[in-house]
Regions:
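Terminal accessory carbohydrate-recognition/targeting modules of carbohydrate-active enzymes
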Residues: 1-165
């Protein structure tokens, strides 16, 4: 069922926002960042969770080496969350949309970049993910496992990033 219902937020964007599917949840702030937050496990609630496993603390984009820091607006739909960035100096409007398909332990992220200059141009987009693989039990120190440093690599053939603890 398609819904045209949406909420736009322009103030108090430090408030939490959740993008959820049946197998994963992405928790961050309405400004598009992933601050340390959480009560059950202090400072560890934010990020991407797939079931009981925390996959990452957050992710970040940059356009032509200019980071997308705090969004100017948050657009909340029943099935997705979008963050609007006005890059005045670069004359760009960027929208980062994210949703979690049901049954998938991951997140789909889409960037829409609107060029506000009269002439066409190319931009370079970079993506950074901060992994923090753990279980809730491990974060509490209840499963006897020691939290280690995550190791990640990009597989060119699969065109995918893989990480492990």
């Amino acid at each position: 069922m398609r819904s045209d219902y949406r909420v736009y937020r322009y103030e108090h964007l430090e408030a939490p926002v959740v993008t959820a599917g049946s197998a994963a949840v992405l928790i961050g702030a309405q400004n598009g960042l992933f601050p340390d937050m959480g009560y059950t496990v202090s400072g560890e609630m934010g990020g991407l969770w797939a079931g009981e496993r925390k996959v990452c603390d957050g992710f970040f984009f940059a356009i032509d080496d200019v980071p997308l820091t705090q969004a100017d607006a948050c657009e909340i739909h029943p099935a997705l969350t979008a963050f609007h960035y006005r890059m005045q100096k670069e004359q760009l409007h960027v929208v980062r949309s994210q949703f979690i398909p049901d049954g998938v332990g991951g997140c789909v992220i889409e960037l829409t970049i609107e060029n506000l200059r009269p002439a066409p141009r190319m931009v370079e987009v970079s993506y950074t993910v901060r992994t923090d693989i753990m279980t809730v039990a491990a974060a509490h120190g209840e499963d006897g496992m020691e939290l280690g440093r995550d190791v990640g690599e990009y597989d060119e053939k699969e065109q995918a990033f893989f990480a492990r603890d």
